[in-house]
């Protein structure tokens, strides 16, 4: 990965994942879920529509430039209204399982996409199992589409699945923005992610997250409703107004974004206040520079004047040794060095006991000069004080150290012997007093210097303490955020466990209901089988009764003979009619009448041959006629049975003897009519006289 945040080759796994994954906007996913719930999930025809809508999420996401940073591809960015537009990766395992489950659904059993309401109605018995274009229940009582949509909606509620800045940088090792030769300060990514998390949490608390607001209720389109058509999460001012209106509390204040953070939208008043403060800061800085430059120039001139006096003093040639006409002893330290780099108390001279001076060659008369070392240290103290007042202490301190090295040559020059002796006298008392006053001045300056150093050290300690407090606050904020994240995960785990327990209970109740339904079906099947067995037994019993009610073989033979004779007589009569022609119709009638009279005489003869006793005899005659009629009827039945037996054989005769109830009635009525036509009942005999 280069310094600009781009990718080197196509072999980078993070780059391939970043390019090939399915990135979808949160509001689009929620809109598809809302439309799917608005449709009838129990209809098999709606399954293809829902699958197409879910498959289209994130399919066309690209900007035709693969070598870009995540921020350029805006998986999470800000709109012109200052609101968050969030993206999720549908290729993550949490979403990939759900998308794969939905994409593999089929309507083969017309049950994969059945809704829970249909399932309850079917199990409770209020609704029969549907077929055709509607969906019923499957064997394992699983309603995959309903459960998948519910799981997808629940996954969108988790903040851990949102791709924030720190998630891109930590998980995929991708820089959020192209790095222009420098890296962002540590903690900027975490701060930006914390702002985004706080924004999302506030939106969920105010019920202004995609899918929570009333605008989503009943929304059946694939694009978001009007308040969400340009952003996913509303701006902070809308969220704060909603929280204040609901009297919830916990308002979110927009934190100023850093140079590498998210560009939060600010109001015009805040921008004007920032501009005013900037101009005020610039003015104060210019004023401080002017005062500092003036003070530094003043003390610089003062320092130059002091150095000029020293130069004039060093350049005086009063004696042959070039020592300036002074002959005195310098009260030095044990090391015989002079150092102005530490404290001025080291250079304080003790009270001189015997100092000599040479009168100056002036018109005003003799003048007693101060000791040379006291005068030099006095001037150096003034120079040191000027350096401290001009805030150039640490800078000029090195210069003073160099000056000390040059001053050693001057000390050697002063220690050289002077040829002109006897010109010095003892110093008066005033000289000692001035020396003591100089000593007090040196001590005062030394105390002030120590106080300045202590103030500087105190300021350093305060700065270090403030830095430690800031680090402690940052660590506390990070620990609180981690604690809140852990609590949220624990709550999510608890909710998932509750859902799992509820699902297990529902499955158990459904299993009990299905077992009861199966038991009911088994009982119904047993009742049906018992009814079938009873029907078959009744049928066999009826067949046995029919077989037992059949006429005997002798009766069948008599009836067959009578019927054959009747058919032969009829055939002979028809043949005679055909031979005689159309004019012999009367003869045919007469022959028929003769046949009828012959049968009547036969009947009468049979009736007369039986003994009669007054009324009882007539009754027996009627009974004989009725028995003859039954004989004819039995003969007709035997005729039908005989005709069938000739075709099917004697073995299966009784199995094919049964006919329909209507045909049996018709056969009996026809046989009775024939018997009444063929048999004429005789007139009852008259009672004997007397």
Swiss-Prot record:
This is Capsid readthrough protein. It comes from Beet necrotic yellow vein virus (isolate Japan/S). Belongs to the virgaviridae capsid protein family. The keyword Cell cycle does not apply. Keywords: Capsid protein, Coiled coil, Helical capsid protein, Virion. Residues 451-509 form a coiled coil. Gene3D superfamilies: Tobacco mosaic virus-like, coat protein. A motif (Involved in virus transmission by the vector) lies at residues 553-556. It holds the Pfam family TMV_coat. GO terms for molecular function: structural molecule activity. GO terms for cellular component: helical viral capsid. GO terms for biological process: viral translational frameshifting. This protein is translated as a fusion protein by episodic readthrough of the termination codon at the end of the capsid protein. Readthrough of the terminator codon TAG occurs between the codons for Gln-188 and Gln-190 in about 10% of translation events, thereby producing the 75 kDa readthrough protein. The keyword Transit peptide does not apply. Residues 583-628 are annotated as: Disordered.
């Amino acid at each position: 990965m280069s310094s600009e945040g781009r990718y080197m080759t196509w072999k980078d796994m993070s780059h391939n994942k970043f390019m090939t994954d399915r990135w979808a906007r949160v509001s689009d996913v929620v809109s598809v879920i809302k439309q799917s719930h608005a449709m009838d999930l129990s209809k098999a025809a709606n399954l293809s529509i829902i699958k197409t809508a879910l498959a289209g999420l994130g399919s066309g996401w690209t900007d035709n430039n693969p070598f870009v940073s995540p921020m350029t591809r805006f998986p999470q960015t800000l709109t012109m209204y200052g609101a968050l537009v969030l993206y999720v990766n549908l290729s993550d395992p949490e979403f990939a399982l759900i998308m794969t489950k939905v994409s593999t659904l089929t309507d083969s059993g017309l049950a994969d996409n059945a809704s829970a309401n249909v399932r309850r109605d079917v199990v409770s018995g209020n609704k029969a199992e549907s077929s055709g274009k509607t969906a019923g229940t499957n064997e394992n009582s699983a309603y995959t589409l309903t459960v998948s949509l519910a799981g997808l909606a629940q996954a969108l509620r988790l903040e851990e699945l949102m791709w924030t800045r720190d998630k891109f940088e930590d998980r995929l090792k991708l820089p959020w923005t192209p790095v222009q030769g420098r890296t962002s300060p540590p903690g900027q990514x975490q701060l930006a992610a914390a702002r985004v998390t706080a924004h999302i949490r506030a939106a969920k608390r105010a019920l202004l997250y995609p899918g929570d607001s009333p605008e989503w209720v009943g929304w059946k389109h694939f694009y978001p409703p009007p308040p969400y058509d340009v952003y996913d999460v509303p701006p902070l001012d809308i969220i704060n107004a909603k929280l204040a209106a609901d009297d919830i509390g916990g308002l979110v204040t927009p934190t100023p974004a850093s140079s590498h953070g998210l560009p939060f939208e600010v109001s015009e008043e805040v921008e004007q206040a920032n501009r005013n403060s900037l101009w005020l800061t610039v003015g104060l800085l210019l004023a401080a520079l002017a005062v500092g430059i003036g003070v530094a120039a003043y003390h610089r001139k003062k320092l130059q004047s002091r150095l000029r006096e020293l130069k004039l003093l060093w350049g005086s040639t009063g004696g042959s040794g070039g020592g300036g006409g002074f002959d005195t002893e310098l009260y030095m330290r044990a090391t015989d060095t002079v150092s102005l780099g530490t404290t001025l108390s080291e250079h304080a001279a003790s009270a001189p006991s015997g100092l000599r001076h040479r009168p100056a060659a002036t018109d005003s008369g003799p003048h007693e000069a101060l000791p040379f070392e006291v005068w030099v240290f006095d001037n150096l103290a003034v120079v040191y004080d000027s350096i401290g007042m001009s805030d150039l202490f640490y800078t000029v301190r090195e210069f003073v150290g160099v000056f000390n090295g040059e001053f050693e040559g001057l000390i050697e020059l002063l220690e050289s012997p002077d040829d002109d002796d006897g010109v010095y006298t003892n110093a008066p008392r005033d000289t000692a007093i001035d020396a003591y006053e100089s000593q007090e001045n040196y001590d005062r300056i030394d105390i002030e210097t120590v106080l300045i150093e202590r103030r500087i050290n105190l300021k350093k300690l305060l700065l270090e303490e403030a830095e430690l407090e800031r680090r402690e606050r940052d660590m506390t904020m990070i620990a609180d955020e981690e604690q809140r994240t852990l609590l949220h995960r624990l709550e999510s785990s608890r909710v998932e466990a509750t859902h799992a327990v509820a699902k297990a209970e529902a499955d158990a109740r459904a299993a009990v209901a299905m077992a009861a339904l199966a038991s009911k079906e088994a009982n119904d099947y047993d009742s049906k089988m018992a009814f079938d067995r009873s029907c078959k037994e009744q049928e066999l019993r009826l067949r046995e009764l029919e077989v037992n009610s059949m006429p005997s073989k002798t009766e069948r033979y008599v009836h067959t003979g009578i019927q054959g004779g009747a058919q032969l007589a009829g055939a002979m009569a028809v043949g005679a009619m055909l031979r005689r022609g159309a004019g012999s119709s009367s003869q045919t009638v007469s022959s028929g009448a003769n046949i009828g009279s012959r049968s009547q005489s036969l009947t009468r003869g049979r009736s007369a041959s039986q003994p009669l006793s007054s009324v009882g005899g007539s009754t027996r005659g009627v009974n004989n006629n009725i028995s003859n009629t039954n004989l004819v009827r039995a003969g007709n039945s035997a005729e039908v049975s005989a005709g069938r037996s000739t075709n099917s054989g004697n073995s299966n005769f009784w199995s094919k003897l049964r006919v329909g109830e209507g045909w049996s009635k018709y056969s009996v009525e026809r046989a009775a009519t024939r018997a009444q036509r063929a048999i004429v009942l005789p007139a009852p005999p008259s009672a004997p006289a007397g």
